[in-house]
Amino acid sequence: MARRCEICNKGVVAGVQYSHSHRQSKRTWAPNIKKVKAIVKGTPKTVHVCTRCLRSEKFKELYKKSLAKMQFNNCIFILHKNKG
């Protein structure tokens, strides 16, 4: 699965983890990415979206407007979440 959000472009970050004795080990932090079926420019598509963008008010407003008016011009709207 892609480790990058297609809306905010959030991706994997590398860094160093320190133990109690201050020994270092390299590690990565990955964002919480979900696969979502959405309508992009009028066509249904599977999109990788982080949970922060999925919960955002802007994203929810776009979804509500799309259901009310059924306008799909250059916007991403959720159809339903994939299970799994």
Curated annotation (Swiss-Prot):
Superkingdom field: Bacteria
One biological process term in Gene Ontology: translation
InterPro entries: Bacterial_rp_bL28, Ribosomal_bL28, Ribosomal_bL28/bL31-like_sf, Ribosomal_bL28_bact-type, Ribosomal_bL28_sf
Keyword Transmembrane tagged: no
Signal peptide interval: none
Keywords: Ribonucleoprotein, Ribosomal protein
Protein name according to UniProt: Large ribosomal subunit protein bL28
